[in-house]
Amino acid sequence: MNIFRFLGDISHLSAIFILLLKIWKSRSCAGISGKSQLLFAIVFTARYLDLFTNYISFYNTSMKVVYVASSYATVWMIYSKFKATYDGNHDTFRVEFLIVPTAILAFLVNHDFTPLEIFWTFSIYLESVAILPQLFMVSKTGEAETITSHYLFALGIYRTLYLFNWIWRYQFEGFFDLIAIVAGLVQTVLYCDFFYLYVTKVLKGKKLSLPA
């Protein structure tokens, strides 16, 4: 495992725990898109269907368990534990416009036409756009809390570091996964505007807002 993947995993874990801690400490999920979190739960479920059949390392298995468990814990807190604080009026992105096309694309463009491979490919495609409901929600409300901004920034850094991970693997291992690279590029591009606003506003103590 190279340094970029490790740092990417650390950034991803940081994003997850920032979000969980924010919800639990404030006893509120205001400003958090339940739809994005539900999409992430679908992503990790589809990606790690091999959890009990394909053992690579303790680290790999542990990360899979953490991602799946934390995604469902987040969904549970939003839609059950702190449901009264969930802002469903602004969380209105039509997620079927993300799920259906990525599912179809996974059937058409994949590495191997087997159930596990199709589900894995679907998870890669869906993850690349899963943050859209959250960004859409921020644009509708006009601003995001600082802690929510930190969460989004950590997610964006995770995807950017994973792009460097793919470059590293191609350079030193000769490994090239076009599906993962293209999906990672799409996801990173979605964060570009947010990155700029994060640096120019949030780091200067101002609230972040996205154009409606």
UniProtKB/Swiss-Prot annotation:
Keyword match Transmembrane: yes
PANTHER family, sorted: ER LUMEN PROTEIN RETAINING RECEPTOR
GO molecular function: ER retention sequence binding; KDEL sequence binding
Pfam families (UniProt xref): ER_lumen_recept
GO cellular component: cis-Golgi network; COPI-coated vesicle membrane; endoplasmic reticulum; endoplasmic reticulum membrane; endoplasmic reticulum-Golgi intermediate compartment membrane; Golgi membrane
Annotated site residues (Important for recycling of cargo proteins with the sequence motif K-D-E-L from the Golgi to the endoplasmic reticulum) in this chain: 193
Name of the protein: ER lumen protein-retaining receptor 1-A
Cytoplasmic side: 25-32, 80-92, 136-149, 200-212
Family: Belongs to the ERD2 family.
